[in-house]
């Protein structure tokens, strides 16, 4: 392929990678800090998308407001869910966590189908982002995709700042590396967990809301994202935000160019990538040596 | 304690599924194996409604016998298909199978139907093999073969002077079969497919493929997607500005039941299908009226397929006065194959392999409707490759 | 792994004489009596059961083999795998592709299915055992997903529609057919034998030094290393054996369904088999079997309109809630319940 | 001073069985253990004492092979075992017990020991043989249980033992692997007086045939049985000598009590609650 095409493909890879990062970062935090494996995380992505769909008529063109409202709702939902459900999982072993969250997926999917049915729905792009610009001689690139990438980047940096600059972030990092130590520091661990979980849900939901206008909303949109996110977390290293970012981008590139060059085998690419990383660094790319 | 549990459980199984005795008199047992949960649930309901509508029009009787329904949710889950179909065949002892939407499931059903010598009418699943290599006298289809709409669109593209085309679809049978049909039709018109693009099902990350299309600059693109994929692909295609320079063609499923979600990005798209909602024939209008009254909802192509499934079955049963005994079997199946179905989509006959020989319509998206434009191919028959019938 | 605690087997009473020590391998009270009785009952069932009921029994029996193979991994070794369906599917594909258009002998198919499933298990094991806990779960899931895509996307296994098994395998000795799986009775008893053999094999395995080493690793791998066990080879061996047995179950499933489909490898299958063993009760072979029965019946119940009316079409909701309630209330599964009942009934010193 | 002079000990009792040179281990920025050299010889109990976080357990973990040292080397029975993984060292005769009791609670005492003994001759492929038929293993198990004074309880399920009993079983399991050297991490933690007595008696009998490293907080006990004492503070050795001279060593007293110290033994014992474990590198607690 010529250079221009190559560059555009890179752009696509980055854009996909960043979106993945938004979902995976929440997942990796929840893993890293609570040590809970949450299969239902994909459902939060779906929740976000459907929130965007449900809220768009209410807020109309107030896109920013819609996002904020969605994030707040999702965070609240996450906070409650942690209190009502996940807080009982910490003492359980991984096996039971897997089964309980697996059951949660079934429940969420059915609730979704009861609430909004099984049809596909589109979500409008805000007018001020609806245009697109010419990209070389090739094609037009919608402004909204640019926005999506930028938004993801902003969130990524914000997240990075929170984790590395604030007291909460300090506790999070400590929690990710050594849970006992945090307890030692006299931190209210339950509250920390609740906040982190709510944050994780909010992140996934935000990703869903940003993606909704691009992907539209449809049944089962969560679980396809989930497994790729697992791969991202494994590659990046549990609990590491930076790792999640790097891994997401890697996956983005492998997926994008896989589709172009080995159409038939493209589905396998990301998993091969994971295998390679496992051979090379079983703890993931960015796992701190503890 | 434990042994009693084990035996109790097995006993439970035993009693729960003891098969009822087969009956020649009494109602005809129709097994509806359709998706009632998950992504295809709405299709399943449409098909069931269509089927029942026709039976009601016949006074609730087929071949002079009452109809008794048995329902199983096939979950669109091929790996469970054999178990699910056996519930109908072996547990409920149905005389006729009606189903389903998902091709993989339908293939397993057809196999079971053949092995247990049960009649089967397929109201949607388009897998070519069902009326091809795996065809059998007792299995007929009221819908289409994946090949048909693709081929028709290929012909249309050829007429429009398309020389270099590309195809995009998911890595799954329905997609690849549809794409093959298109390529075949296009070559008739002197064009050819320069590249097939595909991605894992049910992935929806299309940007890479769109970029590839933009780079190759074909005269046209043919794509097969359904549900969420269809919506997203059409939107992304338009968002990438490709629809301005490179027309996007596809089978009707690309724009059926998805227009509300696709919105502006689908306007003016051309698709081929064996049905169009606004088909202005007395038969279609009557059907739509009756359906709307019966179910307070607008029918779609799936309701039509369900409706016609009942018609084909009725024709067969009529010929033998509802006598399903082995002796009358041949007469029954022959009648089903010979019947000319007066369908809302227009009259059609069945091929030897049991697939409709039907007109393929060219439709154009206007607003939220697929408007009938012209007949793309008249009385198109599936090649039924590999069928011995 | 945080597998400590869940998998505590019932404490054996100390009636044994010195030298005949309490044997954690034989974790089931009553030893072989109960399984043998169950097998006899199953062997007699065809006399009373309708053909459909027989099929259901066969189906459950095959799932039981599958569940037993996973129990060896999760219950006995403490390795929670969320990708076990891959081996089931690979075994099934191996069987179908091996028998081709004209069918093949079981003498050929069984080894093939076992070997290929084991081979993939070896590869996955080598990689995934470099990780532990949450990682291990995710990695096994991911590799199962990879196998899924290979069969679903590529021409390797007939794509998304899968492949049919045109001729069911037979077993011929000196020209005479001794076993023809196309015959319902033959197949029924073949499956029964496989189930019994698998159960016996795993029970034997757990009673052996190898099994005790696995138990030690499950309870406290650190201590085992300190004692001088190189634990990874043990875990790998368990992983491969479990994979091979799952492959055997896959072969039976392919024969039963007369074909294979990539959905067999989907992660929902992996989830369901995990459900089976925890429903029945982790850390007990019987639990795995009971779990297979219970799960199949539970799903039937959730889907039956007769029981739940309109809710039946939303059976996943019911199933999900039931699972949550169950895991929350009975972490040790039905076996645990049985034990509790027994202990209440006859408290032991 | 900071350099422990091994020659003193080697002179006393033949060549060292286990000798570490310049061991160091850093966690991130912090040096848990820094340039520690230590020797163990048969016939000698070498005690390591020190405040919490002095790096005692980290040291044991490096000697047993659970933790790879960032610097230094470990030699055991004439081999350089620095790169050997723990299981290999264990099979070579380097046994250890854990500060936090790590048994197989659901097994019988005998099975606990038999399993440990099995490591020597695993023969895992013979899956048709019941483990309970492992006569050799059982014999070893019963022998070591007797040595540890648990013979009567061979049938009992480990989980039901008293705390002291569990600590004894720990030692028994160590012995079952037929070790030449024993690394004991606070075997007395949380024991009653009379249990402690029994344990000390056991240790003194064992030392005739084993080289023993004893990490302990109970000063009275240490000074009762140790032939040599090494004192660690902040990951470094500040003194290593025979007990009498350690008692009176200024640096040690300052390290423990600040100035104006009476005699260390009583003071330190009072100051350091029994079973108070070092904060660093909890062995047995597996990272997640």
Residues covered by each model-derived region:
Chain D
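Glycine-rich phosphate-binding loops of nucleotide-dependent enzymes
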Residues: 2-288
């Amino acid at each position: 392929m010529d250079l221009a095409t190559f560059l555009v493909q890179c752009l696509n890879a980055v854009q996909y990678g960043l979106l993945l990062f938004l979902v995976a970062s929440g997942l990796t935090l929840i893993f890293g800090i609570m040590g809970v494996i949450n299969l239902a995380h994909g459902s939060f992505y779906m929740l976000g998308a459907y929130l965007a769909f449900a809220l768009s008529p209410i807020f109309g063109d107030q896109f920013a407001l819609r996002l904020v409202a969605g994030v707040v709702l999702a965070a609240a939902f996450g906070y409650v869910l942690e209190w009502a459900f996940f807080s009982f999982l910490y003492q359980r072993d991984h096996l039971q966590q897997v089964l309980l969250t697996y059951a949660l997926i079934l429940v969420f999917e059915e609730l979704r189908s009861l609430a909004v049915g099984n049809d596909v729905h589109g979500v409008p792009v805000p007018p001020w982002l609806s245009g697109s610009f010419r990209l070389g001689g090739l094609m037009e690139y919608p402004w909204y995709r640019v926005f999506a990438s930028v938004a993801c980047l902003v969130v990524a940096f914000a997240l990075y700042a929170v984790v590395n600059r604030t007291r909460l972030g300090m506790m999070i990092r400590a929690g990710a590396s050594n849970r006992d130590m945090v307890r030692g520091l006299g931190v209210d661990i339950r509250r920390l967990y609740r906040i982190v979980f709510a944050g994780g849900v909010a992140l996934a939901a935000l990703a869903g809301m940003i993606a909704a206008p691009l992907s539209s909303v449809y049944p089962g949109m969560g679980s396809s994202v989930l497994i790729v996110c697992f791969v991202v977390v494994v590659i990046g290293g549990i609990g590491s935000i930076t790792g999640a970012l790097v891994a997401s981008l890697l996956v983005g590139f492998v997926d994008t160019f896989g589709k172009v060059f080995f159409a038939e085998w493209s589905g396998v690419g990301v998993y091969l990538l994971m295998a390679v990383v496992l051979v090379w660094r079983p703890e993931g790319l960015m796992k701190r040596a503890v | 304690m434990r042994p009693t549990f084990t035996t109790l459980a097995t006993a439970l199984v035993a009693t729960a599924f003891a098969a009822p005795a087969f009956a020649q008199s009494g109602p005809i047992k129709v097994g509806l194996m359709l998706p009632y949960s998950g992504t295809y649930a709405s299709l399943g309901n449409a098909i069931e409604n269509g089927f029942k509508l026709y039976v009601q029009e016949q006074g609730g009787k087929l071949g002079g016998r009452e109809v008794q329904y048995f329902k199983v949710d096939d979950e669109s889950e091929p790996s469970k298909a054999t178990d699910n179909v056996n519930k109908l065949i072996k547990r409920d002892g149905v005389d006729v199978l009606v189903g389903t939407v998902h091709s993989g499931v339908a293939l397993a059903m057809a196999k079971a139907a053949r092995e247990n010598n049960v009649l089967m009418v397929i109201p949607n699943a388009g897998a070519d093999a069902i009326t091809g290599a795996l065809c059998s006298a007792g299995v007929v289809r009221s819908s289409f073969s994946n090949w048909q709409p693709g081929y028709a669109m290929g012909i249309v593209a050829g007429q429009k002077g398309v020389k270099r085309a590309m195809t995009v679809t998911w890595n799954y049978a329905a997609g690849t079969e549809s794409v093959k049909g298109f390529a075949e039709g296009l070559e008739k018109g002197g064009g050819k497919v320069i590249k097939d693009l595909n991605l894992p099902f049910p992935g929806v990350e299309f940007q890479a493929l769109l970029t590839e299309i933009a780079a190759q600059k074909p005269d046209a693109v043919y794509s097969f997607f359904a549900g969420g994929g269809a919506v997203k692909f059409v939107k992304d295609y338009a968002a990438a500005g490709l629809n301005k320079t490179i027309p996007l063609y596809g089978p009707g499923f690309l724009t059926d039941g998805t227009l509300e979600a696709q919105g502006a990005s689908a306007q003016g798209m051309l698709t081929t299908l064996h049905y169009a909602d606004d088909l202005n024939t007395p038969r279609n209008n009557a059907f739509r009226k009756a359906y709307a009254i019966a179910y307070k909802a607008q029918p779609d192509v799936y309701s039509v397929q369900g409706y016609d499934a009942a018609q084909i079955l009725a024709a067969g049963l009529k010929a033998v006065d509802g006598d399903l005994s082995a002796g009358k079997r041949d007469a029954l199946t022959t009648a089903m194959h010979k019947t000319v179905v007066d369908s809302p989509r227009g009259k059609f006959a069945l091929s030897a392999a049991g697939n409709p020989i039907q007109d393929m319509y060219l439709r154009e998206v206007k607003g939220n409707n697929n408007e009938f434009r012209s007949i793309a191919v008249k009385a198109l028959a599936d090649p039924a490759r590999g069928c011995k019938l | 792994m945080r597998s400590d605690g869940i998998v505590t087997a019932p404490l054996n009473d100390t009636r044994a004489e010195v030298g005949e020590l309490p044997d954690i391998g034989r974790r089931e009270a009553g030893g072989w009596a109960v399984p043998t009785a169950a097998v006899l009952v199953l062997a007699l069932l065809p006399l009373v059961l309708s053909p459909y009921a027989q099929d259901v029994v066969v189906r459950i029996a095959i799932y039981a083999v599958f569940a037993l193979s996973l129990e060896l991994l999760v219950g006995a070794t403490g390795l929670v795998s969320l990708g076990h369906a891959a081996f089931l599917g690979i075994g099934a594909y191996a069987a179908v592709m091996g028998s081709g258009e004209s069918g093949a002998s079981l003498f050929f198919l069984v080894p093939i299915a076992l070997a290929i499933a084991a081979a993939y298990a070896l590869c996955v094991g080598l990689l995934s055992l470099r990780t532990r806990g949450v990682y291990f779960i995710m990695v096994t899931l991911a590799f199962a997903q990879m196998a899924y895509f290979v069969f679903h996307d590529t021409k390797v296994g007939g794509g998304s529609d899968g492949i049919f098994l045109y001729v069911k395998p037979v077993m011929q000795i000196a020209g005479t057919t001794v076993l023809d799986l196309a015959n319902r009775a033959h197949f029924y008893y073949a499956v029964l034998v496989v189930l019994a053999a698998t159960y016996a094999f795993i029970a034997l395995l757990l009673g052996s030094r190898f099994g005790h080493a696995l138990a030690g690793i499950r309870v406290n791998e650190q201590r085992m290393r300190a004692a001088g066990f190189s634990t990874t080879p043990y875990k790998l061996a368990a992983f491969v054996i479990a994979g091979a047995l799952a492959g055997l179950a896959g072969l039976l499933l392919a024969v039963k369904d007369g074909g294979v489909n990539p959905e067999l490898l989907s992660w929902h299958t992996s989830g369901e088999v995990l459900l089976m063993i925890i429903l029945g009760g982790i850390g007990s072979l019987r639990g795995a079997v009971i779990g297979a029965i219970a799960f199949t019946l539970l799903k039937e119940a959730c889907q039956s309109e007769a029981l739940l009316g309109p809710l039946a079409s939303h059976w996943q909701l019911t199933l999900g809630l039931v699972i949550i309630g169950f895991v929350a209330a009975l972490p040790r599964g039905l076996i645990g319940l049985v034990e509790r009942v027994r202990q209440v009934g006859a408290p032991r010193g | 001073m900071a350099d422990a002079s091994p020659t003193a000990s080697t002179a006393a009792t033949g060549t060292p069985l286990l000798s570490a040179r310049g061991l160091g281990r850093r966690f991130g920025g912090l040096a848990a253990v820094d340039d520690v050299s230590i020797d163990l010889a048969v016939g000698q109990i070498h005690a390591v004492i020190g405040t919490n976080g002095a790096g005692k357990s980290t040291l044991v973990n490096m000697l047993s092979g659970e933790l790879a040292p960032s610097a230094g080397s470990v030699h055991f029975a004439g081999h350089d075992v620095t790169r050997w993984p723990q299981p290999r060292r264990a099979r070579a005769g380097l046994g250890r017990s854990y500060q936090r009791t790590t048994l197989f609670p659901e097994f019988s005492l005998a099975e606990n020991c038999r399993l440990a003994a099995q490591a020597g001759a695993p023969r895992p492929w013979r899956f048709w043989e019941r483990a309970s038929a492992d006569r050799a293993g059982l014999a070893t198990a019963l022998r070591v249980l007797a040595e540890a004074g648990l013979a009567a309880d061979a049938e009992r399920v480990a989980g039901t033992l008293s705390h002291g009993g569990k600590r004894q079983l720990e030692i028994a399991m160590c012995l079952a692997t037929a070790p030449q050297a024993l690394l004991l991490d606070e075997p007395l933690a949380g024991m009653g007086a009379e249990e402690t007595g029994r344990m000390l008696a056991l240790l003194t009998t064992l030392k005739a045939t084993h080289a023993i490293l004893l990490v302990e907080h109970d000063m009275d006990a240490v000074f009762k049985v140790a032939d040599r004492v090494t004192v660690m503070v902040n990951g470094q050795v500040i003194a290593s000598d025979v007990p009498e001279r350690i008692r009176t060593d200024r640096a040690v007293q300052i390290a423990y009590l600040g100035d104006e110290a009476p005699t260390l033994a009583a003071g330190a014992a009072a100051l350091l609650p029994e079973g108070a474990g070092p904060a660093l590198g909890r062995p047995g607690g597996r990272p997640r």
